Structure formats: structure tokens, C-alpha cells
Amino acid sequence: MNPIVKQFKYGQHTVTLETGAIARQATAAVMASMDDTTVFVSVVAKKDVKEGQDFFPLTVDYQERTYAAGKIPGGFFKREGRPSEGETLIARLIDRPIRPLFPEGFLNEIQIIATVVSVNPQISPDLVAMIGASAALSLSGVPFNGPIGAARVGFINDQFVLNPTMAEQKQSRLDLVVAGTDKAVLMVESEADILTEEQMLAAVVFGHQQQQVVVEAIKEFVAEAGKPRWDWVAPEPDSALISKVKAIAENRLGDAYRITEKQVRYEQIDAIKADVIAQITAEDEEVSEGKIVDIFTALESQIVRGRIIAGEPRIDGRTVDTVRALDICTGVLPRTHGSAIFTRGETQSLAVVTLGTERDAQILDELTGERQDTFLFHYNFPPYSVGETGRVGSPKRREIGHGRLAKRGVAAVMPSISEFPYVVRVVSEITESNGSSSMASVCGASLALMDAGVPVKSAVAGIAMGLVKEDDKFVVLSDILGDEDHLGDMDFKVAGTRTGVTALQMDIKIEGITPEIMQIALNQAKSARMHILGVMEQAISAPRAEISEFAPRIYTMKIDPKKIKDVIGKGGATIRALTEETGTSIDIDDDGTVKIAAVDGNAVKTVMARIEDITAEVEAGAVYTGKVTRLADFGAFVAIVGNKEGLVHISQIAEERVEKVSDYLQVGQEVQVKVVEIDRQGRIRLTMRDLGSKEESQELSVEQ
């Protein structure tokens, strides 16, 4: 085995690519590492196309092994299970920039598996996996128009930072990942703390320029270790079949694409498609239906794109920069903590907010350590939203990705846990969909959060932009429909407030998208966002002053950290009894901060009084009302404040001589006692004699 190694500096890090030693039966395999974070990436490509294959079967799997961080998995089986949400998102991050680089007509099955085998807690594996996948595909010889580079851009102290460490990311106002070839940006995924459009574009350009180091290094690596390029030629278009499809369908499709209502339009297009297939297969039974459908789809694209470039109205009759009609309702569900319905044309989100306590936080067991997430965002896309039947169950990759994008859009305006001590969960139910449901989720979430009384910094709106480019002509479209997304050259989603951008996601299918085109798209998106925010502010302009009557009230109090053990009790008995008796939830931090949550305010007052009682200090000279807990020959033990027991010696029970304690006291009897002394060991000496004046004494009733 003679491994081939390529090493290069990338910003503040050293990247190493190695091939030839491991997984030699795969089409290509690369061990990619960046400062001790190592990802092993394999590519297997099938030489033959499956019969009847009519789409490109590319699969990307990303998996993290716990041994990479020197840990053993939890749970009963002690091995890794199904991919986590984070793993799914990184798999999508790898997939998105490489998918457009395979030529049209290439239908061979390809599987990319990226496995994290070593992790440095300061270096995120996602970037390493993207670089490794690019290198492995480039080595494999498959018809891949790469390589791509990938860069993470931070924004710290008004400066862009290339590939910031985990520690630096905590100080950064931006987390942007950009991927592209030497000529073009292909993908952007970002979250920002309300930056301007100009700053966001500058970050994209900066990241693309910096990643050229990676692209050049992979090219050199391929020159040394690459396999021969596949002798693959794109299938010749069947001119005769194309002409037949056009003759039958072109005019009818042109009319169908003037129908503004989605369902009616789809029914018409499906009928035309069925007619085309029936007519052509009747003439020639050997013609594949898949081939006819591909030509039909290409014709649809040609018609829609041609009209847009020619300046004609869009599918639903709008101009290029018009946003569809908006309809907003807040407070739509009576018992939830906050809710809103946001409708934009034929896209609709029912957003619901639930407030919980810190114990509702999600604990994420990641390779870099355990952390808590106090803001949860879940996106559901049921089949009825597009008028179809289908499987209902655990979220698919797309739902996870859209939920994370919507969360990124809203995260910048959320209060910290110290400002608003609630765990917040937002669920966006997509009840109708015709383009840009993730951005509808951002708008719906912003409205529902305000309805719930969450003190968000400002309203947030999201908009999806599209682009159609033919040669030197291009048109940027605001608020794209599903068809425009599918048939266009760019999907460009922007979320933000009136003052700046909170999230930007870009997927570009072609080369030649210049920074100037991106700037036009960002400016057009800003105008659309301002329009949507204006309508949203008419519905609800600020967070409600009070949270829902059905939401838990959280009250905080401080106790001496040394007293925490007293409140918890032996084996948690005291705190458990308190929560069960009052129906509250109690959380205690190490610094002595006690958070009590309950829907019933009176229950909270009871708990606070009990905790004050438990943690109260016994004062010498003070008089307390206590209960006799046990009797002894030499005196009686009395529980006073906080269930602290003191001894009333037999000589201190009465003014006269006492022969037998039980003649004067019984267990459970309430008595008034005065604290005579607290010795060094904390033992309390009590008396029932000479209690003094009530004005000078402290009387506390103690409940057992």
C-alpha cells in the first residue's frame, strides 16, 4: 500500500487529503482531516444504469461515530442508531453543491458515505466532510464537473473570519457556509445576527475567494492520484420524438400555464401528459414512457422560462416583483400558548408556540459534548398540503432541513433564557403549499411568538426568490411558486427584520451567477420583505404584554446555595413532595436560583413560602410556633422553622418543676418556644419559659 497524501494550509488550519490505503474496493475513498478532525469519505458509482431509471440516484450519507470523540454510545444497545438531526443536515449540506455538477442525462447510481472517525472539539466536521466528498468524487473518474471548495465565514469585531473555531463561533455574528467551483458559487447556508444585505453578500464573495485554495489543492491531488475519467457521453436527444411531443402538447401546455389556480392547472397538465403518452405509445409501443415524460417536462420548462425572459406575466399573472396576496390571523387556537395562520397565495402555515420550563429543553448529545437547546422549531409537511395522499410519520430530510432554515430565520430575535426563562417550541404545520413554505414558516412563527407574549426583538419575515437566466438575459422573481422553483436556475431564500438579514439560503443550479445578480436579488428580496412585514405589523405589531393564561408562570427566587440540599431533601424527598402536593415544577441552579413554574399562581405562592420556611435561618432570641415531634425522659424535641428540630429540656418546659414530660406535652402538639442558643454544631436549645414580649419576637407558623 502506497498512500498518496496532499497537505495544504487553509486559513489558520492545515488540511490533509489521503487516498490509496483504505477502502480500495470503493470507486474512490479519501481520508480528509483538518487539525485532528478526520472524516473518511467513500464514493461508489455503478457502471451500469438500472433499466427504466428516469432520475439521477445520488445518495449522501453522513455518520458520526462516537469513538471519534473517545466516547461509548448511551442507551441499551451501546451503538450508534439512526442519523440525528445534525447528521441529516450535514448530509444535505454535502449533497446540495455537488448535485448540480453532474451532467444532465447521467443516471448511474452513486453513493457517498462520509464517516467522522476523529474529532477535535474546536473543528466542526461538516466542512471537512464537504472537502472530502469533493476530493473523492474528483478522484473517482465519474463525470463530475468539480471539484468544489467549501468555507465557513464568521463575522467578529466587524471582520470576516475564515473557518472560525468553535470558540470563535460563539463570538461571531455570522455563521455562513459557502460552497462552489473555481468559477461559481453553488450553495450558501447561513444564520446571522441581523446583518445588512451588503455584509451578507461580501461574506459570500469572501468565502468563495478563500476556498479557491481547496479547489486548486484537489486538482493537484487528482493529477497525482485520480482514476481515468469515465468514457461517458450524454445520450443524443431524440429529435423525432421531441418534435412529436411538441406537436401534440406545445400549444395546449401554453394555455395550461395561463391557468392561475394550481390544482386546476395541474389537472390540465396531467391530462395533456396522459394524452401525449397515449398517442405516442399507440404509434410505437417500444418508446419508453420515461423518455416521453422527460421531453414533456423539458417542454414545460421551455414555455415557462421563455415567457418570463420575454417579460410576459408569470404563471399566476403576477409581475416579477409582486408578492402574492397575504392573509393573517393570530390567536386562532384557544388553548395553545400562541398561534397564527399565515397565508401567502396558495402557501399556508399554521404556526403554534408552546412555552415550557427548563426541564423541557432538548439535551443534544453531540460529538463535541452535551448541550441544551431551549428554542425548538419543528416543521411538518403533510401530504394533504399539496392535495395528495402519502405516508405520515417521522420527519423526512426535507422537513428537517426546512425546519432548521426557519429556526435560523427567527433565532436572532429570540430573547435569552435569562431575559425570558422559558423553553420555547414552535411548530409550523404546512396546511397548503405552492412554493416557499419554509419562509411562510418564518412569518407564521414570528406572528405566533408575538401572540404568545414572547419578547422577541422585532418581527421577522422570509421570502423566496428565483432566477431565470438565458445567455446574458436574466430575470429575478420575488415570492416564487413551486413550479418556478423547479424550473428556475436559482432558489434564494432570505429571512430578516426591517434592519437586516437573519438567514440566507442559496442553491444555484447553473454557473454564471455573478455577485451583481446576487445583489439585485438581495435588494428585490428586501423590498418584498418590507412589504410582508408591513402587513404582519397590521395584524400584531408587538409581543402581547401577558403570556397565555394556559401557559406556566415562572417565578424566580434566590436562596443561599448552601441551603439547596435542604430544599431538595434526602433522596429528593422534600422537593418531590412539594411538586406533587402543589402541582408545580421546581428547578434549582447551582447559584441558588430557584425557578418555580405553575399555571396556578396561588400554588407558586405556597411553594415560595415553603421554600422560604425551609431555608430560613433560626435566630437566637426569636420566638417560634413549632410542633412537638418526639418526647424523651430529658425533654421534648420541637420542629420549628424549616423543620429544624430543637430540644426543650425538661427544666425549660414550665416555670414549676416537671416530673414527667408527657404530663405537659404530646407529640403533634403546637407550642410556642424561644431559641436560647445555637451551638457550634448547629444544635438548637429551646425554652418554653420567659418567652418575652411579642413585639420583640418573631412568630412563624410551621406546617408539617
Swiss-Prot record:
SUPFAM superfamilies: Eukaryotic type KH-domain (KH-domain type I), Nucleic acid-binding proteins, Polynucleotide phosphorylase/guanosine pentaphosphate synthase (PNPase/GPSI), domain 3, Ribonuclease PH domain 2-like, Ribosomal protein S5 domain 2-like
Record keywords, A-Z: Cytoplasm, Magnesium, Metal-binding, Nucleotidyltransferase, RNA-binding, Transferase
Catalytic reaction annotation: RNA(n+1) + phosphate = RNA(n) + a ribonucleoside 5'-diphosphate
GO cellular component, one term: cytosol
EC number in record: 2.7.7.8
Domain of life: Bacteria
Magnesium as UniProt keyword: yes
InterPro entries: ExoRNase_PH_dom1, ExoRNase_PH_dom2, ExoRNase_PH_dom2_sf, KH_dom, KH_dom_type_1, KH_dom_type_1_sf, NA-bd_OB-fold, PNPase
Gene Ontology molecular function, alphabetical: 3'-5'-RNA exonuclease activity; magnesium ion binding; polyribonucleotide nucleotidyltransferase activity; RNA binding
Name assigned to this protein: Polyribonucleotide nucleotidyltransferase
Gene source species: Mannheimia succiniciproducens (strain KCTC 0769BP / MBEL55E)
Lineage: Bacteria, Pseudomonadati, Pseudomonadota, Gammaproteobacteria, Pasteurellales
